[in-house]
Amino acid sequence: MLIPDVMLIPDVMLVTFVILRAKPEESYTTEKETIMRLGTSSPLTHNTPQEWAENQVKLGCRAVVFPVQSNEPKEKIDAYKKAAEEHDLLIAEVGIWRNALASDLDERTRIRDYCVAQLKLADYIGARCAVNVAGAFGPRWDGPYRENFTKEARTETVKMVQDIIDRAEVTNTYFTLEPMPWMVPTGPEDYIRLIEEVNRDRFAVHMDIINMTNSADRYFNAEEFVDKCAGLLGKRIRSCHIKDVHLKQEYTIQLEECAPGCGEFPLKHYVRKMHEIDPDMPIILEHLNTDEEYIKYMEYIKTHIVN
């Protein structure tokens, strides 16, 4: 029920991966595909925890984003945790995706509490990390504002991370911030500086190389930029996102996020470097709109990037 015939990518040559049209009860992966901890940010359409896990495995995933929130029943959390364990699905991350620096103090308090609860959830289920963005000093929760780069913003970001980690008191996971083009941290050096400022052993790195590709230099020297990120951040990286970036021809510089294979980023080099850092490093496909798109581009990753 997961991969319809019409979702094959045109002109894909299948040399190593030969099970695209499997029956629903069969696996869609080969032994070689299962080496890397690929995953998606989508839970895919499902009715039970068991079906969720089975669908992920059939797609070729060995890592998942946990699909249950901290405010849901413990029985549901436990059922998904068990399903992941039974299918050797590494829980890569627990998402937060809220503005923990919101200007409204009541809203900020509610979001901070949610951050703590999500981090505790990550600790309970054994996820590699809980992940958020630093936050924005404007109406859009993840928006681009000059105020994001003030001294006050950095001070508040450091205090926010410390507060969340100190309150959660986790021992089995890490709190991470996804780097962004227009908020702290914007690059590997900035991330190292932030780690030093936060000074908490449960603060680590979430890698999104495309979010940090925010200049012509990083775009045109992408392999060197990947190497720099790997060298500076290395073992601190807990989970990675994968997508692509396209440079549009119109003035002025316009870097557009897109699906893997629709841009020019050296994704093979990126994936190889992350895998060298940790053979269990989760590589998570994100920002697609439908199950069909996740199926399509996961097959692209398996045949063109991992192969």
Where are these regions (language model features)?
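A cross-taxon signal for low-complexity, glycine/charged-rich
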Residues: 13, 25-27
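N-terminal pre-domain/capping segments
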Residues: 2, 8, 28-128, 162, ...
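Short, electropositive alpha-helical surface patch
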Residues: 147-154, 184-199, 256-270, 293-307
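Acidic-and-aromatic substrate-binding clefts and catalytic sites of carbohydrate-active enzymes
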Residues: 42-50, 66-78, 99-109, 138, ...
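Short beta-strand segments at enzyme active-site cores
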Residues: 66, 92-94, 128-135, 173-178, ...
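Intrinsically disordered, low-complexity proline-rich tandem-repeat tracts
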Residues: 2-4, 8-10, 14-16, 20
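Acidic/histidine-rich catalytic cores of soluble enzymes
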Residues: 94, 162-259, 264
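Active-site acidic/histidine proton-transfer and metal-coordination neighborhood
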Residues: 85-86, 105-205
